[in-house]
From Swiss-Prot:
SUPFAM superfamilies: ALDH-like. Belongs to the aldehyde dehydrogenase family. It comes from Pseudomonas putida (strain ATCC 47054 / DSM 6125 / CFBP 8728 / NCIMB 11950 / KT2440). The keyword Oxidoreductase applies. The keyword Oxidoreductase applies. CDD domains: ALDH_F5_SSADH_GabD (cd07103). Keywords: NADP, Oxidoreductase. It holds the Pfam family Aldedh. This is Glutarate-semialdehyde dehydrogenase. Its EC number is 1.2.1.-. Gene3D superfamilies: Aldehyde Dehydrogenase, Chain A, domain 1, Aldehyde Dehydrogenase, Chain A, domain 2. The active site is at E255, C289. The lineage of its organism: Bacteria, Pseudomonadati, Pseudomonadota, Gammaproteobacteria, Pseudomonadales.
Length: 480
């Protein structure tokens, strides 16, 4: 792999300021999803190494939380600057291990860095309260303190941003963190922690443990020194982790599955709706928890929208993310390909028609697909595809589409396009989702609270609210 700074390609885990192999010497192979080639290996660590990382985090905690907010902020600010300075290398690493086009990878690095920049400033805005006393001789004060040692388990689809959204607020609050990245995409995490080290983040404050999900995750949830876990991934695994954390009453933040509706009303600007659908559906090849999974189009504009969407999809260029001009890379692996094929076959068997795409090209490359006349009984109406499949459902009126949109256990992101302002407010308030994109298909940023309701999770990331999950509220009652 050709990088300007070869030291960013790390094949060891980072624990307590040291680059280490697994105790037993075992490794995990990391492959390029575009070529199938082995990029390298990382240590297959387990319980013992994870425990040492947690103990190092606990040992580093007193000194880190004792720093002033301004001192922690300065170190985070330097980490942000190093990410921007090394954006090209970080993006190339990401594209190689994850597959997304280089332009998207560069965008993710900027997005990931924005959380470090934001929380570097939020570190200095952790305010308490003074409450009027309930008696003349009482003074009531509320302060906020770091929760302690924290843990994070992050996914492969956004291997940099999902880390900084968690590590940024944790470190800003004065907490320490042990991170377990996805085994498919560990190199982005290891490069980020190398830059954190260069930024002056002390040993033990941020460690990265690669290896067995069961053993590493089990120690993170089972070790009583860990006071909070943040996880991004499937609802099934989120439930399991929540159960494991219950033993020690750990604080838990969960960003789980989604099944986002994307609604096009008959008064929408169709060109803008198509533009938003392309961004929402096909960004990262549909492998995002907030991507449009169900596209609902009102009867009067259904055919026109489908035609315009097909024309836009035809312009997408599929290929290796490192090749210039590529807009759509591979899916992460064969299981992801199989899920897309399964949803297409199920929908077609129930009456849907393939308007465009629908076929495997080779390896992990799959054609961006549009299905029309999709019935409500299709699996894709209930299940998250996590791939480049856009199923178009018809609807008659506002009440019908709101009912269909809310008919799911998930509640992460939703989108709709409309011009009528009364409708905008009615629909936005009626949709049972943590986030609503109105006349836009791209809603994620560092200043807004990201998170879902129902089975899509607990807590929020980003924004002024993101740091709250890493703080404990303490009330002081003073007699004067």
């Amino acid at each position: 792999m050709q990088l300007k700074d070869a030291q960013l390609f790390r094949q060891q885990a980072y624990i307590n300021g040291e680059w280490l192999d697994a105790d037993n010497g075992q490794t995990i192979k990391v492959t390029n999803p575009a070529t199938g080639e082995v990029i390298g290996t990382v240590p297959k660590m387990g319980t013992a190494e994870t425990r040492r990382a947690i103990e190092a985090a606990d040992k580093a905690l007193p000194a880190w939380r004792a720093l002033t907010a301004k001192e922690r902020s300065a170190k985070l600010r330097r980490w942000f600057e190093l990410m921007i300075e090394n954006q090209d290398d970080l993006a190339r690493l990401m594209t190689t291990e994850q597959g997304k086009p280089l332009a998207e990878a560069k965008g993710e690095i900027a997005y990931a860095a924005s959380f470090i920049e934001w929380f570097a400033e939020e570190a200095k805005r952790i305010y308490g309260d003074t409450i009027p006393g309930h008696q003349p001789d009482k003074r009531l004060i509320v302060i906020k303190q770091p929760i302690g040692v924290t843990a994070a388990i992050t996914p492969w689809n956004f291997p940099a941003a999902m880390i900084t959204r968690k590590a940024g607020p944790a470190l800003a609050a004065g907490c320490t963190m042990v991170l377990k990245p996805a085994s498919q995409t560990p190199y982005s995490a290891l490069a980020l922690v190398e830059l954190a080290h260069r930024a002056g983040i002390p040993a033990g404050v941020l460690s990265v443990v690669t290896g067995s999900a069961g053993e590493v995750g089990g120690e993170l949830t089972g070790n009583s020194l860990v006071r909070k876990l943040s996880f991004t991934g499937s609802t099934e695994i989120g439930r399991q982790l929540m159960e494991e954390c219950a033993k020690d009453i750990k604080k838990v933040s969960l960003e789980l599955g989604g099944n986002a509706p994307f609604i096009v009303f008959d008064d929408a600007d169709l060109d803008k709706a198509v533009e938003g659908a392309i961004i929402s559906k096909y960004r990262n090849n549909g492998q995002t928890c907030v991507c449009a999974n169900r596209i609902y189009v009102q009867d009067g504009v259904y055919d026109a929208f489908a035609e315009k969407l097909a024309a836009a999809v035809a312009k997408l260029k599929i290929g290796n993310g490192l090749e210039e001009g590529t807009t759509t890379g591979p899916l992460i692996d064969g299981k992801a390909v199989a899920k897309v094929q399964e949803h297409i076959e199920d929908a077609v068997s129930k009456g849907a028609k393939v308007l465009s795409g629908g076929k495997l090209i080779e390896g992990n490359f799959f054609e961006p697909t549009i299905l029309v006349d999709v019935p409500k009984t299709a699996a894709v109406a209930k299940e998250e595809t996590f791939g480049p499949l856009a199923p178009l459902f018809r609807f008659k009126d506002e009440a019908e589409v709101i009912a269909m949109s809310n008919d799911t256990e998930f509640g992460l992101a939703s989108y709709f396009y409309a011009r009528d302002m009364s409708r905008v407010f009615r629909v936005a308030e009626a949709l049972e989702y943590g986030m609503v994109g109105i006349n836009t298909g791209l809603i994620s940023n560092e200043v807004a609270p990201f998170g879902g309701i129902k089975a899509s999770g607990l807590g929020r990331e980003g924004s002024k609210y993101g740091i709250e999950d890493y703080l404990e509220i303490k009330y002081l009652c003073i007699s004067v």
